[in-house]
From Swiss-Prot:
The modification 1-thioglycine is found at G84. Acts as a sulfur carrier required for molybdopterin biosynthesis. Component of the molybdopterin synthase complex that catalyzes the conversion of precursor Z into molybdopterin by mediating the incorporation of 2 sulfur atoms into precursor Z to generate a dithiolene group. In the complex, serves as sulfur donor by being thiocarboxylated (-COSH) at its C-terminus by MOCS3. After interaction with MOCS2B, the sulfur is then transferred to precursor Z to form molybdopterin. The lineage of its organism: Eukaryota, Metazoa, Ecdysozoa, Nematoda, Chromadorea. This is Molybdopterin synthase sulfur carrier subunit. C-terminal thiocarboxylation occurs in 2 steps, it is first acyl-adenylated (-COAMP) via the hesA/moeB/thiF part of MOCS3, then thiocarboxylated (-COSH) via the rhodanese domain of MOCS3. The modification Glycyl adenylate is found at G84.
Amino acid sequence: MVSVKVLFFGEAFQLVGKREETVEFPAETDYEELRRIILEKYPALSKIEKVMMLAVDQEYANPGDRFELERFTEIAVIPPLSGG
């Protein structure tokens, strides 16, 4: 297990009430496991579960992606993007 920083933006921040927190993840993991762990730890995110995106070290993550997490890894929880 490795402790990594999880960052919350926009509606994710509003739902969780924190900008960032350190969370334990397996050092070798995949996109699906990252989502599962984050949603278990922060059930309020279920409101945006179907539309939220994850980024690992400032790169968008996709289903099927695998990761080797390290102590300085950052995971961002990004709500649906909107604009005009």
